[in-house]
Design a protein with these regions (language model features):
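Histone-fold recognition with a strong bias for associated Lys/Arg-rich disordered tails
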Residues: 1-165
Length: 165
């Protein structure tokens, strides 16, 4: 089952691609949408990401490098194979781990398997790794310590791990 936040994130990704008249929704569209997903944002902060810079970089890539996706058809944007693989990986992982709900943090981790994507390149440009994200989600270990205070102040659900300490 998808969390409400993830449902909204996927809708934003597909709607953003459609708004740009792109035939396909790519991982970059998904990454842009994850920048507004509370679960993913907590992970971004834990990994020390500069979200403003990341947003600018993703938008620059989408606007300048994906112009070949512009279509004259007015239909909905279709997820690329990479986009679909990420969602399939998340579903399999969450199901095998015994959890019931997929969220944006899970999607962010799964994106790292798409090594050839520009979305992953942009994450790595700011020194974010899959391990950084997994450490935060699974163990509450932030790459940067000030994020723990941020997450506690905002009572983010991913902080349940820290509250057990």
């Amino acid at each position: 089952m998808l969390s409400t936040n993830l449902e909204q994130t996927l809708h934003r990704a597909l709607a953003g691609a459609k708004r740009r008249r792109h035939e396909y929704a790519t991982l970059e569209h998904l990454l842009l949408a994850l920048l507004e997903d509370p679960d993913a944002v907590a992970v971004f902060h834990a990994c020390g990401m500069d979200l403003e810079q990341l947003r600018d970089d993703v938008l620059e890539y989408i606007d300048n490098e994906l112009s070949n996706l512009i279509t004259t058809h007015s239909g909905d944007a279709k997820p690329t194979a990479g986009f679909q693989r990420v969602l399939q990986r998340v579903a399999i992982h969450v199901q095998s781990s015994g959890r019931e709900e997929l969220n944006g943090a899970n999607v962010l981790v799964a994106m790292f398997w798409e090594q050839e994507s520009h979305a992953v390149y942009l994450l790595q440009e700011q020194d974010m790794t899959r391990l950084d994200a997994v450490n935060y989600i699974s163990h509450g270990i932030a790459k940067v310590t000030q994020v723990i205070d941020y997450a506690r102040r905002h009572q983010h659900p991913l902080q349940r791990t820290l509250e057990k300490e």
